[in-house]
Amino acid sequence: MDVANTENRCRGFTLIELVAVLLILGVLGSGIMLRWAPGDQSLSAQADLFARNLRHAQAMAMARGVALVLDVKTASNYAITDGTATIRDSAGALQNFTLDNGVTLSVSNLRFDSLGRPLNGGSLMSAAQSWTLSGESSTETVQIQPLTGFVTVTP
């Protein structure tokens, strides 16, 4: 009588399990290393956020059919206003923003008309407008193009 001997089987991990664990550890490790990387990481993130808020102000002006202003109040605070008061988005959130970690912004306002076109005073912009965001050791520039309102961020 031949009885299968299961007691002598080697126990361990399969190749797929080992590869999956190494892959997960690699992803987690790279995320941790990026957070510990030297340099002013928050400056880049804040410049991207400022650019997104410019696009958001433009989109809200078109959606609402009214002129809106990106109002840079101080070097570390800006808001989306109707020219007098800070507005709320469709979710009810007040559109007031503060830069973090000592990042500062050059003070210059921008108005969008109801078609989303950037204005300089009361007329269409004829040249690009720029804002400089400054961190501890570097700067980034956010620029908006005339007529289209295309926004770019450059280090």
For the regions a language model picked out, list residue spans one by one.
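N-terminal helix-rich module
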Residues: M1-L22, V27-A51, R55, A59, ...
